Amino acid sequence: YIDGDEGILLYHGYSIDQLAENGDFLETCYLLLYGELPNKQQKIDFDRCIMRHTMVHEQFARFFHGFRRDSHPMAVMVACLGAMSAFYHDSINITDPQQRMIASIRLISKVPTLAAMAYKYSIGQPFVYPRNDLNYATNFLHMCFSVPCEEHKISPVIARAMDRIFTLHADHEQNASTSTVRLAGSSGANPYACIAAGVACLWGPAHGGANEACLKMLQEIGSVKKIPEFIARAKDKNDPFRLMGFGHRVYKNYDPRAKIMQKTCHEVLQELNIQDDPLLDIAMELEHIALNDEYFINKKLYPNVDFYSGITLKALGFPTE
């Protein structure tokens, strides 16, 4: 449920603030799948079920070698998700509730593995297998950033930030990618094909690509000294330039996800002791201006979730693309 005027986002009656601060992503997944939060035993069983299915078919390793190493990760993800219907064709009957649930479990458990493999392939490092003894977010970061030749420890602050990013993006009513998935599903297409279509839609700069576009804008600005010039351009109706990461088509108030992401972003920067990154300096100054400039306040152009998530993901070590 979304109330754009009041800046409210609820998942089955629970505010996004409650879920992000007091729960975790898999708890949110359970809520979205079953309509209620799990009790202690249900949470243990659900977490165990997800973590036991994180490995992907070994042939996927060969599948990746068909891509150029400089392929955009979203192109790789669309292909991999579509390919899941070939590797896991025992759960593609969309009319069977049990098969739909199996497909849902497989998607939640295996997509982080495929995403990490896409990243590792792009930088020429060996794939890292998932570890069932780690929680969901920590496991994803482990697969992305650990290497076989040395031990890699992940800070709880960093893992918590990743988990919050997952939770904040778990659902957003009838957005473009959700509409795409539902449209594909209306034809009776299998769940993996439907999700692949949704990921293709998510690739667009007006949707999931917004945080990437925001970081590219920060690169275009180049330095803190040039911010006033770009602010003036953003206010000029005749200039095609616009600030990415500010305002939202649904929220006419502060994006509730942005408040959580803002806090998370600053926690990550403090944990990693990042103080001299020029892009982050530009972002922090832009944030300060947007929250104090009458033009932005009157037009309700507050920093949105994409503004903070892009900065946070960059700080965590993910490349812009």
Curated annotation (Swiss-Prot):
The keyword Endoplasmic reticulum does not apply. GO terms for cellular component: cytoplasm. It catalyses: oxaloacetate + acetyl-CoA + H2O = citrate + CoA + H(+). The keyword Magnesium does not apply. One of its GO terms (biological process) is tricarboxylic acid cycle. Its EC number is 2.3.3.16. NCBIfam families: cit_synth_I, PRK05614.1. Belongs to the citrate synthase family. This is Citrate synthase. It comes from Bartonella bacilliformis.
